[in-house]
Each structure stands twice: as structure tokens, then as C-alpha cells.
Amino acid sequence: MKEQNLTPMEKLATFIVDKRNLFFLLYIFALVFCFFSTGWVNVENDITTYLPEETETRKGLTIMNEEFVTYGSARVMVSNISFAHGEMLKEKIESIEGVSEAAFDSSAGHYINSSALYDITFDGTASDEISVHAMHEVKEALAGYDVYINTEVGVDSAADLKQEMQVIIVIAAVIIVAVLTLTSRSYAEVPVLIATFGVAALLNMGTNFLCGTISFISNSVTVVLQLALAIDYAIILCHRFSDEHEPLEAREACIAALSKAIPEISSSSLTTISGLAALAFMHFKIGLDLSTVLIKAILLSLLSVFTLMPGLLMLFSKLIDKTGHRKLLPQITLIGRFDVLTRYIIPPVFVVILGVTAVWANKCPYCYSFTDLTTAKQSESQIAYQKIKNTFGAGNMVAVIIPSGNYRAEASLLQSLESAPEVKSAMGLANIRAMDDYTLTSALNPRQFSELAGIEYEVASLLYSAYAVNDDQYGQILKGLDQYQVPLFDMFLFLKEQMERGNITLEEDIQETLDDLFDQLEKARLQLKTDSYSRLVVYLNLPEESQETFDFLKFIHREAGRYYDDNNVYVVGNSTSDYDLSSSFGQDNLLISILSALFVIVILLFTFKSAGLPVLLILVIQGSIWINFSFPYLQSSPLYFLSYLIVNSIQMGANIDYAIVISSHYKDLKKEMRPKQAIVEALNEAFPTIFTSGSILAGAGALIGQMTTNPIISAIGVCLSRGTLISIGLVLGVLPQILVLGDQIIERTSFELNHINLTPKSFSGVTRVQGRIRGNVNGIVEGSFDGFIRGDMEALIISGKASAVTEESFKAEYQGKSYAGADTPTLSDSGGKENQAPENIVKGESANEQTNKTNI
């Protein structure tokens, strides 16, 4: 291969192959860096973080996190004990340091059918060490009992998921090695492929820190999906190298293979990238997170295939030659023949199935809460949750955040909510009982407060005077303090402040009583009141997710709107999160479906240069999507909405590659044989690629679905595996018939893009030229001509064509034509005689002919 005759792509391939040791060194540095940088990645485990900023849940959670303290809690059920034994355990639990309260009584909400339920509250948040240690002590105290614990305290779901994914990756690696061995042409190709994608995976994990914070979904499934989605790229280059290596040496074969594979692989990756890019347009920002991380994974896989794998192929070339083996995958000629025989039967049946499944998929029951999703593998926490739910029911709590300061309005709102049959209980400062039937927000005058607190009236009067001065209410002092009323909660906090400053000293027994009271009031303040907001805690008799629940959330807003500006009222909880997600799902679903299909159609339009073929391919893959999401409807099993959005985009962006590879082979083979024969041969040629990619993606999805306890990740895996298998079935059992029947449509809607190839082409010897060219020949030619050029030619082929011919072909064609100034078809070097053949004979447009140097 002459250096001056190389195309730009061949020059790039030559540089990569010849500088492979430099690339090895760069990858070593990058891998060392990424090994350490993987620990820099921040992983977000709370999916509500990705809710749009304008949603009520996101606004409310921001206020709650900034203004209030939420103490850790646990629901603990102990079965097969008597009520008396249950009371004994309550005292035992409450004696543990770090446990604030263990609610238990004889009501059906706490004791039923020999099972006791304790609602435990800790002295710290769910992540505080005091709560974690107390939870550990509770487990030890209940060891030996039939106990079920549902809590977030001391539970590291991220670590559990990471451990599960490590096991999944190991098993997936074994499956991938087995599949690659079946589809390889040499056993030594397998370590090359594994090394290439091992490097790509580590590079992706090591660069995730550039995204700032990524979701636990992206962090857990990206590695497996990266391998499954991008393994084709390495296989294409590997097979190209194998083909080129038959007549060429390893270096030349690698250069030729890489120069041909780069455009082929790049175009193949566009459909996958476009499908993933559609996720970025979701209102739910988890889509942008997944899109960013997965597209980065695909791009790094491409980089590894283009720059690392050629060097590995050169390194392993001798071993690849020695370990070659026969094809292990069988031909699927029988399937191809069956497709041809059923070409008039399957398509009509498919159209009917398409219509039915489109309706079923539209009726797919979606869910927006993952608490009730069941997984094939259950964690102890999930088992406990289901056990407690089946015995005592599931708790559904929402927090109502309102402006603080108006205790009367708060009390009225609480009373209104408690009177609703949908409410189990409602709690706020305005309805928490203190002493003598007073609530914490009851307004007391000095005499009432002195009697309640057990202090002298004079001390209480001084305290009220100081409070009035501190609150700039001097008029109350002038009017007299007997009628001056201050909410009990505010006055106790003011009393505490004055005692801490040393302005008031009480008797020791009263001091101890008030200290205990102050501790309880401080906890209540941290949980329920700040300077700007108050928080009401409402327990509902409704499921976490239902239309009735969503309607009642609107009722809460209407009631709160009677006392407060509704723009300053926020209802926060799992139910509101589900409502916000359901509100945006319809729009996100439509957006992703349209964008992913549109992106893919545009790419296919320019790939196949046909308007009909992309529509047929999209129809088949869309059919696989509808069939996939008909299963939840038929099984009456709710589907987590995020599973639909993610799998929909992956199926449209990645599974369509299976249809593309069959169509590409069919279109090429159709030039050499009849459509029926072409489709059979196309299936045989495409099957190894489809088998490799499809089996890995389906296997990876099945592993994720069956081996993780995280309901979101599991749901994605199950849908992805099922969707991939359906896609494979349709492209092998339906698409061939459609291609054969629709052959006329494909041909009639085909088009060619007129373009100028600006890449100079070089020829030496006798060259046939048909068209308009511009460049250096031997002489100056500008105009229309149809003939031959003798000598060296380097020119742009503006229109028409040019090709080298043999002496014999030249003489044979020359004898049948008459060229000006030529009598004898004799070819010789420049400087010929009068009766020699002309030195420059071309077909096309030419002008300005000279005898020495020709610029065309």
C-alpha cells in the first residue's frame, strides 16, 4: 500500500496501528487514573432528587431538608407473643439508649392475631450513629423472636446493590465469554474482545465523576448495558481483521480492517446513541442522568475499539492464527426458507397482532411507587415490609408544610383533616396535648401559666413582661398582664431561654420536671416548627398510590387554602411524589417515543437512501415494543413507569440494529441473486451478529431482573430481557417476509443523493474516465470527453467515473471507436509518434488540451 495513495481514513488507521505502543502507554496512564477516580463518584440514592424543580414534592422536600429534622424510625413486628409479653418487650425496647419511643398499645393497629407492632422513634436521624447503634441494640434485644423489621436506619441499600451488581457482572462475564467463543473465528479473539471492553468499562466508571453526581440506576446498570450494547463494535472490527488477514500480513490487514470498520461502526452506533439521547429530553431528570452516562459509555467503547483494539489484534495476531476454529454457530437456512414460504401468511397475522398489542400496551398498568413492586430475589427488609403490610396494613404518611405563626389556623386545619374518613390521624403543634387538657399552642395568661408550670405568679408575671418587651408588645404591659395571653409552646421556649441565661432560677424539683419538658418541646420544635414554616404530619387510610389518594391530596390543598395562601402550602410524601411522576409521565412517554423514532428514521433514511425501508424497520421494532408492554396488562401486574421509558428508548435505539444488519445484507445480496435467495443468505450472514448482541443483552437483562433486590433495577432488567427476545424473534420471523413482500416499495422509494466526492483519487497506467474531473494528468484538459488517459493521474472525480483498465481492454475498446488524431491503438510511453494512440483518452467534460502536463 503506497503511502501517497492512502485515503484520509487509511492514513488515520495507519497512524493508530503504527503508534500502537504509544496508545498502550496512554491507556495504562488512563487506567491507573480511573482506578482511583472511581472512588470520586457521588451516587444519589434518592430518586426524588431528580424531580423537576417546579414540582410540589421537590419544593417541599427542599424546605423539609433545610428547615426540619426528621428522626429515624422503624416498624418492628414480633409474631407469636401474648399482649403481656408485648408490653414487656415495649419497656425493654424503650430502655435502649437512642430509642426515644416505642409506641405500642392494645389497639388493632398494634396488636392482632398474636403479633405485636412497635412504631419506634430514635433520638437521631436515620443516618446518625446514635440511631444506627440503637437499631443494632434493638435487633440484639429481639434475637430469638419471630421478628420482622422495616426501617431505613442502618440499611445501606447502595452497598447492598453494589454487592449484587458485582455478582451479576461476574456471571455476565462468564456468559459473554461463552457467547463470544461461539461467534468467534479464533479462540484468541475472545481475550482481545474482553480486554477492549474491560478497558472501556473502567474508563467510563473512572470518568463518571465528571458528571458530578450520578443516580444509583446509572451507577449500577451502566457496566452491564455498556457491554451488551457496544460489543458489536469490537466484533465488527475483529471479523474485518480476520477477512483482511487472509490475503494480507497482520499490519496491512489491521490497517485495512480499521479504515473500513471506523465508518461502519460509527454509523451503527448512531441509532443506539440517538435512542439514548431521547432520554435526555425527559422532564424527570433521571433521563438526562442515564442518557449522559450511557452515551459516554458508548463513546468510550468506540474509542477503545478504534484506538486500543488494533494494537491488541497486532499483539495477538500470531496466537489468533494458531487458535482458529470452524464456525460453531449453525446456519439458519431452515428459518430463512420458512420465512420465504410464509411470506403471505406471517405479515397479515403480524398486522393483526400489531393492532391488538398496540391497544393492550396503551392499557398497560403503570405504577410510580416501587414499595409494592415484588422482585424475584427479596431482601430481608422487603420480606419484612410485606409481612407487616399483610398483617397491619401499610402506613402512608404525608407532611403538610404551612406558614408558621398562626396557631388558630393550624388548629382549624388539623381539626378539618382529622374529621375526614381518609385520615387515620393528624399531628401538629396545635393538637399535641400538654397538661390539663391544654395543647402546646393554647394561649395562657400569666396566672394560668404559673399554675401549669408550678411557679409563683409574680415570677410568671415578670416572665410575661419580659416576653412582651422581647416581642415589642409594650402596650400589653400598659394595659395589664392579666389578659395578656401567650401560646404555651412559645412561653415554655422563652422560659427555657431565660433559665439558660440565668435570669430565672427555680426550685430543683421544678427544674428537673421542666428540663424533661424542655427536651420534649425541643424535639417537637425541630420536627414541627421553624421561624418560617410549620409541619403537620398526616397518616392516611389510603394506599400510597391510587386515584382516590391523588384526589385526597387535592382535598388537603383545598382545606389548607381556606386558611393560607395555597402557593405557600406544600404536601410532601410518597403519594405526592407518585402524583408528580404520574403527571409528567404522559408527556415524557410521548416525547421519548416520538424523538427516538424520529432520530432513528432520519439516520436510516440516509443510511439506506430509501423512504420505505426505514418505515418497515421502525414498524417491526415498534411492534416488539408494543408486544413487550402488553405483558403487564395481560398479567395484571403494574409496571414501574421508569422501566417503560428506559427500555422503550433502548429497544428503539439498540434492538433496531438487528433489523438494520439483516436489511443491509439483504440489500447487498439482492444485487447478485433473487430476493428469495437473498433473504435466506442475509439471515445466515446476519445471525452471528444478532445472536451475539441479542443473547448478551437479553442475558444481562435477565440477570439484573432475577438477581437484584432493588425493584427499580429489577423491573428494568426484566423488561429489557423480554423486549430483546421479542425483537430477535420478530427480526428473524417477521422482518424477512416483510422485506420480500415490500421489495417493490423499497425499490420505488429509493433515492440517491447527488454529491461531489472531494477526495482526490490517483491512478497509474491506463485509466478509463467517464465524467467531469479536475486535477493533474499529463497535459491540460478541460471539457467534456469520453476516453482514456495514459500516464499518472491525480484528480477529483466531479461527475461520472474513472477506473484503471488493462492494455488488452484498452485495445479491444479502442478498435471500435475513432479518436481524433489516432489511427493505431498502440500504447507507449509519452513522447510517442504521430500514429500512436493518444496519451490522454477520457469520457466526460474537458477543455484546454496540451501535450505535456494536463490539469483537469
Question: In which residue ranges do the predicted regions lie?
Answer:
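Basic-flanked hydrophobic alpha-helices used for secretion and membrane insertion
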Residues: 418-419, 499, 503-512, 534-541, ...
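Juxtamembrane segments of multi-pass membrane proteins
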Residues: 51, 67-73, 81, 344-469
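Membrane-embedded transmembrane helical bundles of large multi-pass transporters/channels
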Residues: 1-43, 126-369, 373, 544-547, ...
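Structural beta->alpha junctions
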Residues: 77-84, 119-128, 151-154, 374-378, ...
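Structural signature of multi-pass, alpha-helical inner-membrane proteins
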Residues: 2-28, 35-41, 54, 59, ...
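Short, hydrophobic beta-strand segments
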Residues: 72-77, 114-124, 360-361, 366-370, ...
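Extracytoplasmic
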Residues: 54, 58-59, 67, 79-121, ...
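Solvent-exposed, non-transmembrane loop/terminal regulatory segments of multi-pass membrane proteins
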Residues: 39-75, 363-401, 515-523, 765-771, ...
